[in-house]
Each structure stands twice: as structure tokens, then as C-alpha cells.
């Protein structure tokens, strides 16, 4: 799974905010406008084995990974900020477990 810098080639690119397949899936599951500015993203610094899942206004969950950058666990809090997730959002995200995380351009 490739992480794409939210602010590629802009002065904010060092903020380490990225879009990926998981954030796109969360946007769809929550019913967010795909062309809107309010979207899910992850923070990535590769230091602690965890990518916080965020949306403007708060941190909603995390993507955990091992030393090989393989996703081992994903969890989203369904009662904080975004209230439009389906009841089985966490189950639907399990399809990403086992994928390798890579930084894209």
C-alpha cells in the first residue's frame, strides 16, 4: 500500500500527512465527498510502528505495522468526530492487514 503525500511539492510536504488506500476506503465508508477537502489521512514518520488515522478535528484510529512495514492491525473509533461509518467499518478494514506500507511520491 503506497502512501501519497497530501501536500506533494508544496511547502507543507514535511508535515508527513499522507493519503492511501485505507484513507480512501474510510472516506467512502463515511460517505465523504471524494472531491471535498475534508478527508481522512495518516501521519507517517516511521518511528513507532503506528500510523495515526486522522481527519480534520481529531485522531480516529491507527494502522499498526511490524519492522518490515507489514500492516498487522487497523482500528477506527466509530464514536468520535465521524459518526457516519457503517457498524462493520473495522471488519471491512481488515482486508488491508498483511499489505506492505511504502512511501510514494
Predicted regions, residues:
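Generic short N-terminal amphipathic or hydrophobic helices
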Residues: 3, 21, 70, 100-102
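Structural detector for short beta-strands of small beta-barrel domains
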Residues: 5-8, 20, 24
Amino acid at each position: 500500500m503506497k502512501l501519497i503525500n497530501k501536500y506533494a511539492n508544496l511547502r507543507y510536504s514535511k508535515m508527513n500527512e499522507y493519503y492511501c488506500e485505507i484513507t480512501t476506503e474510510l472516506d467512502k465508508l463515511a460517505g465523504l465527498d471524494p472531491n471535498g477537502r475534508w478527508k481522512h489521512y495518516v501521519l507517517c514518520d516511521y518511528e513507532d510502528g503506528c500510523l495515526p488515522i486522522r481527519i480534520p478535528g481529531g485522531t480516529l484510529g491507527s494502522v499498526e505495522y511490524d519492522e518490515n512495514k507489514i500492516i498487522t492491525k487497523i482500528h477506527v473509533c466509530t464514536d468520535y468526530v465521524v459518526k457516519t461509518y457503517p457498524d462493520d467499518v473495522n471488519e471491512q478494514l481488515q482486508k488491508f492487514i498483511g499489505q506492505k506500507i511504502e512511501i510514494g511520491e
